[in-house]
Amino acid sequence: MLDLRNVAQNFDAVVARLKTRGGNLDLGPFQRLFAERRELYVSVESLAARRNAANEEMKRKAKEDPKALDALRGDLRAVSQEIKEKEARLKDVEEELNRILLLIPNVPHESVPEGGGAEDNVQVSIWGQKPDLLFAPKQHFELGEKLGMLDFERAAKVSGSRFTFYKGALARLERALVTFMIDVHTSKGYTELLPPYLVLRETMMGTGQLPKFEDDAFKTLGEPERFLIPTAEVPVTNYHADEILEGESLPIRYCAFSPSFRAEAGAAGKDTRGLIRQHQFHKVELVKFAHQEKSLDELEAMTDDACDILRRLGIHHRVMLLCTGDMGFAARKTYDIEVWLPGQNSYREISSCSDCGDFQARRAKIRYRAQRGDKPQLAHTLNGSGLAVGRTTIAILENYQREDGSVAIPEALVPYMGGLKELKPI
């Protein structure tokens, strides 16, 4: 959530930068309500001063002219009633301003290029080479079904579309990837968390999933209302909600494995086959809490930590700096890591790493003291996939496929696979 006073004091500049994100953004009501809020504050303060003066006058009159007290009491009641009415209206105005702020995305950082969509993203680095396959490569779902290790048909029977059963060695590969990723990240100073998969509404509000993206969430019907997490970012970021951290403890780094659940409300007709866009998928998430002036450096480090998984797996990839029109709601700066998929003959996102500034921390009330005894200030939060496990499985299937339909297992994963070096049809 943006800072109320900053939006009001720098309204034109904030609106201009937000408009580079695209979409329809009407902040006219914000200006009107903020002006009313200011007037109400002035009025309430003035009335409170009148009430205080009336109280003092009553004390004086009680000694000098007791007969005048009735008139003064009437005036005091009228002033008190007016204060009560204006304070009630002030509460309504502030609640409405808060509702507006909850729907406004983060302001892009000045280093983020302007643009309307993916075509305006900027490549900042590239690693490795595309595999030199001397045959027509297959897509991952063709390979998985031929291996007898991906079963979309039975999953549809059980759960409907956009689900799958992993089977045999491919199920083990997915599990091996999770352990491998966690091992790599914890070796770099990340602390592993195993989070809850169901969270409260205020938890989803804290990271910015709600209220704007409620249609893309799965939720329970009972009370209290709970949501299945769309990413471990949600519970892990809120791990420090309503807390004041000590500056010397920052940056705090967490990694967490979890299933992720998404309704994919706007994905009709997109990636209908395979593992790219599922209602349930696995992900290892990276989350950081940083000093305000150091979060951009932490974003660079986090992005490299995610890329390191792909380097160790020997998979060609590139890093893209997202333009203003392609960034997520809570992010002020984002790098997408895109992996090459020979079967699709295209790059596909396997990780998004974002610096959210104080946007989430303001919602979740996550603060820190730079020095002991200092006034608390909002922390900066960062998050990124390290990596999306299903999409990493896709990348292995397509990049390590052989002409006979078997798939080599990357050397780094062989110890996690009990020495197994290839996937062969069941």
UniProtKB/Swiss-Prot annotation:
PROSITE patterns: AA_TRNA_LIGASE_II (PS50862). It holds the Pfam family Seryl_tRNA_N. Pathway: Aminoacyl-tRNA biosynthesis; selenocysteinyl-tRNA(Sec) biosynthesis; L-seryl-tRNA(Sec) from L-serine and tRNA(Sec): step 1/1. ATP binds at residues 262-264, 349-352. InterPro entries: aa-tRNA-synt_IIb, aa-tRNA-synth_II, aa-tRNA-synth_II/BPL/LPL, Ser-tRNA-ligase_type_1, Ser-tRNA-synth_1_N, SerRS_1_N_sf, SerRS_core, tRNA-bd_arm. L-serine binds at residues 231-233, 285, 385. It is found in: Cytoplasm. Keywords: Aminoacyl-tRNA synthetase, ATP-binding, Cytoplasm, Ligase, Nucleotide-binding, Protein biosynthesis. Homodimer. The tRNA molecule binds across the dimer. NCBIfam families: serS. Catalyzes the attachment of serine to tRNA(Ser). Is also able to aminoacylate tRNA(Sec) with serine, to form the misacylated tRNA L-seryl-tRNA(Sec), which will be further converted into selenocysteinyl-tRNA(Sec). This is Serine--tRNA ligase. It comes from Myxococcus xanthus (strain DK1622).
